[in-house]
């Protein structure tokens, strides 16, 4: 009995819809235009507020004075460079424990190549002599284990027929 009632209710719901979207007026074009207008005004207001905050920050930045008691101060390089030498006036090297740095007049930022010395060492690349061990094809297949080498030696390579 329950199955008959359930089956009848399912068929009635499929054939006779209870509500439609038209009954609420959601497909009315006037309502869509109204909602589009509201979203457009909302977007314009948000864009105006964002631009006001963005451009007012750059004008307010000099108003903040950096003091000694402030927790976070902006980096002020002043007359220092990005890679400045520490303790420049005394010429001490912090990597050597503060000992004075020896200045070598020949030591520059870049050393030039000395072609005459380089030419002697690399003027000619010598060739190593060929090593021949065992049969003639050992040079092709190096590093074979003894079992694999025996199998290789037992097989004879045949020449390919000409094309």
From Swiss-Prot:
Top-level division of the source organism's lineage: Eukaryota
What GO MF annotations does this protein's record show? protein homodimerization activity; transmembrane signaling receptor activity
Q: Which GO terms describe its cellular component?
A: alpha-beta T cell receptor complex; Fc-gamma receptor III complex
**Per the record, which residues fall in region Disordered?**
83-111
InterPro entries the record matches: CD3_zeta/IgE_Fc_rcpt_gamma, Phos_immunorcpt_sig_ITAM, T-cell_CD3_zeta
List the subcellular locations: Cell membrane
* PROSITE patterns, sorted: ITAM_1 (PS51055)
Keyword set includes Signal:
yes
Positions in the Cytoplasmic compartment: 52-163
Q: One biological-process term from Gene Ontology? A: adaptive immune response
**Pfam families noted in UniProt:** ITAM, TCR_zetazeta
Q: List UniProt keywords, sorted A-Z.
A: Adaptive immunity, Cell membrane, Disulfide bond, Immunity, Membrane, Phosphoprotein, Receptor, Repeat, Signal, Transmembrane, Transmembrane helix
- Report what the Swiss-Prot or TrEMBL entry states about this protein's PTMs: Phosphorylated on Tyr residues after T-cell receptor triggering by LCK in association with CD4/CD8.
Topological type in the membrane:
Single-pass type I membrane protein
Cleaved signal peptide residues = 1-21
Similarity comment: family membership:
Belongs to the CD3Z/FCER1G family.
Outline the subunit composition: The TCR-CD3 complex is composed of a CD3D/CD3E and a CD3G/CD3E heterodimers that preferentially associate with TCRalpha and TCRbeta, respectively, to form TCRalpha/CD3E/CD3G and TCRbeta/CD3G/CD3E trimers. In turn, the hexamer interacts with CD3Z homodimer to form the TCR-CD3 complex. Alternatively, TCRalpha and TCRbeta can be replaced by TCRgamma and TCRdelta. Interacts with SLA. Interacts with TRAT1. Interacts with DOCK2. Interacts with SLA2. Interacts with SHB. Interacts with ZAP70. Interacts (tyrosine phosphorylated) with SHC1 (via SH2 domain). Interacts with PTPRC.
Name of protein: T-cell surface glycoprotein CD3 zeta chain
């Amino acid at each position: 009995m329950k199955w008959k009632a359930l089956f009848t209710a399912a068929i009635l719901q499929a054939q006779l819809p209870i509500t439609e979207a038209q009954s609420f007026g959601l497909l009315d074009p006037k309502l869509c235009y109204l909602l589009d207008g509201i979203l457009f005004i909302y977007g314009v207001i948000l864009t105006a507020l964002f631009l006001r905050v963005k451009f007012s920050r750059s004008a307010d930045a000099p108003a903040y004075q950096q003091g000694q008691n402030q927790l976070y101060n902006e980096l002020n390089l002043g007359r220092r460079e990005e890679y400045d030498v520490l303790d420049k006036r005394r010429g001490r090297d912090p990597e050597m424990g503060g000992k004075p740095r020896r200045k070598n007049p020949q030591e520059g930022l870049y050393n030039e190549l000395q072609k005459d010395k380089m030419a002697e060492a690399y003027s000619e690349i010598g060739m190593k002599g060929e090593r021949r061990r065992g049969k003639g094809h050992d040079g092709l297949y190096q590093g074979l284990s003894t079992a694999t080498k025996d199998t290789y030696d037992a097989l004879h390579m045949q020449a390919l027929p000409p094309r």
